[in-house]
């Protein structure tokens, strides 16, 4: 409009000059042709200006700016080019100025009408243009920065899952905004700069106006004439891309799979083989079960086979090393009446409690495989009822356990305490060890077959009983030893009942022994134990400790651990030397009942002597250093009856016995340093008594016995043959044997200054009958302070000897 005003002003000025200067009529006629040309030029200029304005308006609607032509330059160039003509025809133009003004007005009206028509045409033509853009040019939208929005949005949807969720949510909100005719703008919440950039680009993609609020953190979008909804949603692009990617990945995975290659190769090599992938779930489960059963069955079979293989290997070793006892078998844990095998409750270490001569099964806990002569094993009766066997390596390293560990069943504990016996031997080549199993039981059960007692090797022709020494003083002459279970007396090898007939010279010496024991009341009587009554014989015996026939094993459940001095024995023992073990005694021990004839005899032994009684109850009290352990239910009374009358059945009435008080210290512990012990099984070639196994106290542990406030106990192991009943050969005075020649007092010297016994020694008497050839019999006193052990009569020729060692040993 400013340009038109300038033109009008110029025309008005020209008209003014024409009015002032009057011209002749012929001049006016000459210039009419020129005036028409000028009018045409003016019309062309106005039309060009109008078109430029229309273009600028339409470009502003599209967001583009176009520069209009410079009119001043053309207007300035026109007067310069036509200056000559103007000067020549000024008078003509001035004459026709009035007509020109009228024409200009009509032209302006026409131009305004044309402008209005053009605007209406532009408005009607914009709608089809938008439709054409949404259909044909949807892929051609670009941002103000020149970024292709379609490509940017597709890449963002593919690559970033977080941006994908933002774009999908934003798309839904914008579509809802466009569909809502009531709202003309929408304000997004405050967000980060990256998210605002996404909003700007999505709004531009939808043809919306997008700006930022005053804070600069929120985007406001407005509807425009170019607002559109794209035909293809964002989720459609995702579906297409996901389908393509998944197909590509699947193909690559199939091609690059090494498992599939191996399967394909195997299938090519074996075309009739079923493919691994074609197996169903049921087939896979069946195959898994088969493999599982095979594996676990193999383990159980191997564990059981290893036990028997090792047992057989040990048996072969013992047969090779000991040629004189090739036919003797290793004792394994018997199966109980229910046919229960030893695999369920029996560990492999319990079956490994057997060793061959000079060769013990190697244990993984051995620190030195060459150290075979180890210290005694120790059986521990813990509160849980298990029995652990520990083997000492040497006298100095008491903390190193190199033996097997053996544990009995959990049912072996009882209120009175469980008890067991140790079985550890290392015999030389000349003899077979007496090994007893670990046994512990609760009342009313037979635990030895169930707990799996370790293997025992013993001569088949001898067995041993440990009896208190006090029984020798309380048994009246002419008494017969009866079997408490059968009621039958023990018989000699010739079939005659075994009659106990001590010599007359033993009576005064017996009283002398009692006198010596009474000379030390402070050490014998300071801590008396409660009196223990006689337990009735139980029908079941627990823990056979000697390998004999079944009737023997079920009746006598004792074992002894003999202790051998380390180097002070006057004569090397004929039996093997082994470490002995110290076993805490349970609350009760096997009781020995002596029924005398009618005569009154004083209470013998080394405990405090009580009033004269006709019957004596000899029951060892608990002791921490026990060599014989018997479960509480396995009470085994031994009855002595005078000669001439004895019961022949188990219905014979037995009188109750009077209790005898014993002194023992349960809390005393036995030192493990430098303890040597010896199992001395006696080699026999004849029936009858084969010998005596004794226990000798080493000088290192003598102070333990002497320091205890009780009476040191000497025990003797009496051997008896395996016959229909226990045969204890006794002698009678009527046989006319020169008994005084076989009875020699044996002094038991103790170390001076220890205060338990006088240094002069303690006499021990032997009453032995000579029906059978002589054998090596050893009578060795142990360190057990619980009770005393009688010297039983043995059927062999004797030579009594004395020892100067701590402890005592008798050789026959």
Curated annotation (Swiss-Prot):
**Intracellular or extracellular location(s):** Cytoplasm
Q: Which residues carry this modification: Asymmetric dimethylarginine?
A: 655
- Give the span(s) annotated as Disordered: 1-130, 246-281, 332-436, 485-544, 561-632
InterPro entries tied to this protein = R3H_dom, R3H_dom_sf, R3H_domain_containing, SUZ
What is the residue range of the signal peptide feature? Answer: none
UniProt keywords (A-Z) are: Acetylation, Calmodulin-binding, Coiled coil, Cytoplasm, Methylation, Phosphoprotein
Kindly list the positions at which Phosphoserine occurs in this protein: 33, 56, 134, 300, 363, 383, 562
Q: What Pfam families does UniProt report for this protein, alphabetically?
A: R3H, SUZ
What ranges does the record list as Pro residues composition bias? 619-632
Q: Where is the composition biased (Polar residues)?
A: 361-373, 582-602
Tissue specificity annotation: Isoform 2 is expressed in brain. Isoform 1 is present in immature thymocytes (at protein level).
Q: Does the keyword Phosphoprotein apply?
A: yes
Modification after translation, per record: Phosphorylation at Ser-56 favors interaction with CALM1.
Domain of life (superkingdom): Eukaryota
Positions carrying N-acetylserine? 2
Q: Which Gene3D superfamilies match?
A: R3H-like domain (3.30.1370.50)
A cellular component term, taken from the record's GO annotations? cytoplasm
Q: What does this protein do?
A: Isoform 2 may act as a competitive inhibitor of calmodulin-dependent enzymes such as calcineurin in neurons.
Give the quaternary structure: Interacts with CALM1.
Protein name per UniProt? cAMP-regulated phosphoprotein 21
Taxonomy, top ranks, is: Eukaryota, Metazoa, Chordata, Craniata, Vertebrata
